[in-house]
């Protein structure tokens, strides 16, 4: 264990040194300054409130989404495919995956709700009043309490949402559609091209034929989830999991329907 911690410290230190030029540029860029000013308006704005983080798993097809119409909600990545049938739009939309953003650029350009994207996405998404740039990284494990600084992506956009929700002050965060299970198998983070309808998400065209995407890294995402659970607990807040049939075991489970008044 001490050796593992030592190796992780050395790796994190090396990552930090390698990130310095990029992080310095990001910190000095006027687009980031303007974005951070907008981000600060969200800090603790929803203190004491609850929110739902909507994953994109197939379980959404067995989840009564109509119940969320008057709730604070985080949508992720290509949830806009569900907007027509939802009858409402989520409070926020979050995406930090380059492949998703690049291949869905027209959709993201048309988003009018508050949009949170990685700093890397500036090459496709120029500044706009509803767009917020997050300086996210693949390495350097951490939970960012202040999202105007660096966030670790934790191998899943859900982890970015958990950091955003904490920054915004939400006291109870409820996960739905976070199935934590994929029919498509392979090496974590490997980029593949979909050969047909998508069996891993709520819509067959989510990562439909010809779409490039990266295979999930569920182990790394669990590292992030454990960090999030601890930070929320230490702050007297909670994350619970109401995913229908989900395989994630990090957070306490709750039956989705029990969260709403009859």
Feature annotation, model-predicted:
Residues 2-262:
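Metal-ion/cofactor- or nucleotide/acyl-coenzyme-handling active-site neighborhoods
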